[in-house]
């Protein structure tokens, strides 16, 4: 799968671009996706406009119904991802890839309205992350990954 990355923040994402391309390299899709890094304010506005939720969130995804070559767009709140990576005591790379895979699964039709649905999504996400050594087991054993 090809991904196109857009950075609408003032935070450098060069190292994130490499790992995101690597994780989606293993996905056997012909369509591409866009991953867009945005600010908390932009995310809050989008969350309110599209979901009527008046707060910023970490990730939103939207299916692209116009361009048949594109599966959709994944918007990631980079500041929130930074905070969450610190709260969960893992690398920013893991958090961003976790959010990107989560958004991708939503584009593929997965939902998490129940605990079972969420568990199924989390298992798939961890399998995807494991392919680039960002799964939970690797991170907890290898503390040097926390230096992103």
UniProtKB/Swiss-Prot annotation:
Do you know which Pfam families this protein is assigned to?
Answer: YbeY (PF02130)
Positions annotated to bind Zn(2+): 102, 106, 112
Q: Which GO terms describe its biological process?
A: rRNA processing
Q: Tell me where it resides.
A: Cytoplasm
**Matches recorded under SUPFAM superfamilies:** Metalloproteases ('zincins'), catalytic domain
Q: Which GO terms describe its molecular function?
A: metalloendopeptidase activity; RNA endonuclease activity; zinc ion binding
The cofactor remark states: Binds 1 zinc ion.
> Cofactor(s) for this protein?
Zn(2+)
EC number(s) reported in the record: 3.1.-.-
Family recorded in the similarity comment: Belongs to the endoribonuclease YbeY family.
Function comment: Single strand-specific metallo-endoribonuclease involved in late-stage 70S ribosome quality control and in maturation of the 3' terminus of the 16S rRNA.
Q: What is this protein called?
A: Endoribonuclease YbeY
Could you tell me which species this protein originates from? Phytoplasma mali (strain AT)
């Amino acid at each position: 799968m090809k991904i196109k990355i857009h950075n609408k923040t003032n935070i450098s994402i060069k190292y994130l671009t490499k790992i995101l391309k690597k994780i989606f390299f293993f996905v056997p899709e012909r369509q591409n996706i866009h991953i867009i890094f945005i600010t908390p304010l932009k995310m809050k506005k989008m969350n309110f406009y599209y979901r009527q939720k008046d707060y910023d969130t970490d990730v939103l995804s939207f299916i692209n119904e116009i361009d048949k070559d594109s599966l959709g767009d994944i918007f990631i709140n980079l500041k929130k991802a930074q905070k969450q990576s610190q709260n969960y005591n893992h690398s920013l790379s893991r958090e961003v890839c976790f959010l990107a895979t989560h958004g991708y699964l939503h584009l593929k039709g997965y939902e998490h309205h129940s605990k079972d649905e969420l568990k199924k999504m989390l298992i798939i996400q961890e399998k995807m992350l494991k392919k680039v050594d960002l799964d939970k087991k690797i991170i907890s054993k290898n503390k040097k990954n926390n230096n992103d």
